């Protein structure tokens, strides 16, 4: 089996979904920009040697329909010989894209792949056209398809208070703002044109979604968003709605060495797992444990974790049961997470992996885990190792 390595990883800035910088920019344009960007940043890679593109996207309709991976590749002017497929594991779609490409490379079916994902939640809302089968109600409660209520359930099961959620949300914005000011995101963001609040074309270089003005008092004043009578989850402690894309250049270790490309990280192991849909946010716990077992590692071996923050009420139980509460500030989401940056569904998997790899390089960490929950009860995790 061949070793799989990441030689480059980038993302767009995260744009606010409601009247944000990408309101006139289509999902295919966000995607094509990154595909072209990876090749421009790595001129030693012959595009004709790329086997396949795996691109995550959840709402595959409207501008994101009819295989957005292929549409974006053609829009980017990539060789027509490069195949492309769109991957959907809901929130874990672009991490699944990485897993699919990695397996193809491991068994020799590919040497070089582009992976990534996109979601334009401003143009294609999360619930657009969704029609659940009525028969699901025999085994799954209707509320299991309502992500906010699953977060409420998970938070109550683990005794997570409103105050803990608000503090976690505040920290996400503070860390993301600090990362922006300190330039920690500069190595992963590929600037792209968008439009400012006046509709003027502008170069977007930073995330639009972060709210540095957030305070505990402001968060405490928000009403519960999903369970008005007894809830604790608010818009402020939930992942923001944002638009964005992310991408990675993935290849065999042999090919990277042949091309003289720096190996930024190796895919050490991968895993997915299912869990009760009513507590879908718990998926990272079994997925992470499974991935670590496959890598022959323990939780103590991992120096950095990147956990997608769907909700504070969902993140904190996962952090608790992974034994990370006491080291959360030093090990988990150093640059904040989706509460501050947003969660463009198909983009997030490779986005958090990209942020993890950049943080591993910045801090000198050798081993890291990127993991996320997935709607309707799944989790996905990837263990990365720096050379």
Swiss-Prot record:
It is an enzyme of class 2 (transferase). It comes from the Bacteria. InterPro entries: FadA, Thiolase, Thiolase-like, Thiolase-like_sf_Thiolase, Thiolase_acyl_enz_int_AS, Thiolase_AS, Thiolase_C, Thiolase_CS. GO terms for cellular component: cytoplasm. Disulfide bonds: none annotated. Keywords: Acyltransferase, Cytoplasm, Fatty acid metabolism, Lipid degradation, Lipid metabolism, Transferase. GO terms for biological process: fatty acid beta-oxidation; phenylacetate catabolic process. One of its GO terms (molecular function) is acetyl-CoA C-acyltransferase activity. Gene3D superfamilies: 3.40.47.10. Its EC number is 2.3.1.16. Pathway: Lipid metabolism; fatty acid beta-oxidation. This is 3-ketoacyl-CoA thiolase. It comes from Aliivibrio fischeri (strain MJ11). The gene is fadA.
């Amino acid at each position: 089996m061949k070793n799989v390595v990441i030689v480059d990883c980038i993302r767009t800035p995260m744009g606010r979904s409601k009247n944000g910088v990408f309101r006139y920019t289509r999902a295919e344009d966000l995607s094509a920009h990154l595909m072209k960007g990876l090749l421009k940043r790595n001129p030693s890679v012959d595009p004709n040697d790329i086997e396949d593109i795996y691109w995550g996207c959840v709402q595959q309709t409207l501008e994101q329909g009819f295989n957005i991976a292929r549409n974006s590749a053609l829009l980017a002017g990539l060789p027509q010989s490069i195949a492309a497929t769109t991957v959907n594991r809901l929130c874990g779609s672009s991490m699944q894209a990485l897993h699919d490409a990695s397996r193809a490379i491991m068994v020799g079916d590919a040497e070089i792949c582009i992976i990534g994902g996109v979601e334009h939640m401003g143009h294609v809302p999360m619930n657009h056209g969704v029609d659940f089968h009525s028969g699901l109600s025999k085994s799954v409660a209707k509320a299991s398809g309502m992500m906010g209520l699953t977060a409420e359930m998970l938070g109550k099961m683990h005794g997570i208070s409103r105050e803990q959620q608000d503090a976690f949300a505040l920290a996400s914005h503070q860390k993301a703002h600090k990362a922006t000011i300190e330039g920690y995101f500069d190595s992963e963001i590929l600037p792209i044109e968008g439009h400012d609040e006046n509709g003027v074309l502008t170069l977007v270089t930073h995330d639009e979604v972060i709210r540095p003005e957030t305070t505990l008092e402001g968060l405490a004043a928000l009403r519960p968003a999903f369970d008005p009578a007894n809830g604790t989850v608010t818009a402020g402690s939930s992942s923001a709605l944002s638009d964005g894309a992310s991408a990675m250049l993935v290849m065999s270790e042999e090919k990277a060495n042949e091309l003289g490309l720096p190996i930024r990280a190796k895919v050490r192991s991968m895993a997915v797992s299912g869990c009760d849909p009513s507590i879908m946010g718990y998926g990272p716990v079994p997925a992470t444990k499974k991935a670590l077992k496959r890598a022959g590692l323990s939780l103590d071996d991992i120096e950095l974790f990147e956990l997608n923050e769907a909700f504070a009420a969902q993140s904190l139980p996962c952090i608790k049961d992974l034994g990370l509460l006491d080291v959360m500030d030093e090990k988990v989401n150093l640059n904040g997470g989706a509460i501050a940056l947003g969660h463009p569904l198909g983009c997030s998997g490779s986005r958090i992996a990209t942020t993890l790899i950049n943080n591993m390089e910045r801090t000198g960490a050798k081993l890291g885990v990127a993991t996320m929950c997935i709607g309707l009860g799944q989790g996905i995790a990837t263990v990365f190792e720096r050379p």
